[in-house]
């Protein structure tokens, strides 16, 4: 059974920082690109960050709205992906999900700024 479990959300003041984590199981994590997406009433579903494989030197890509503020990383030995979020803004509020190329999804973690 594939599982993705996010954690680390909560309430933070504007300008603050927060780190989200996602632990995966049930598939070979190191073989999958990983993404963070978020959902809010205002913007709907919004892709925010992607990290590729070791063979791609863990290349990362970001939505313009978070570039320079958010950093995605992964630890294949722990089947985990992370999202460090700095200088948070009200518009970053939403449920944040980790996903493997949109095939598998976690339950999400709510970030409120």
From Swiss-Prot:
Record's keyword annotation contains Membrane: no
Biological process terms in GO annotation: immunoglobulin mediated immune response
Disulphide bonds in the chain: 22-98
SUPFAM superfamilies per record: Immunoglobulin
InterPro entries: Ig-like_dom, Ig-like_dom_sf, Ig-like_fold, Ig_sub, Ig_V-set, IgHV
Domain of life (superkingdom): Eukaryota
GO CC term (a single one): immunoglobulin complex
Ig-like domain mapped to chain residues: 1-113
One of the Pfam families matching this protein, by short name: V-set
Keyword Magnesium found: no
Molecular function GO terms recorded: antigen binding
Keywords tagged on the record: Adaptive immunity, Disulfide bond, Immunity, Immunoglobulin
Note: This chain was isolated from a myeloma protein that binds inulin.
Family matches, as PANTHER family: IMMUNOGLOBULIN HEAVY CHAIN
Protein name: Ig heavy chain V-III region E109
Originating species: Mus musculus (Mouse)
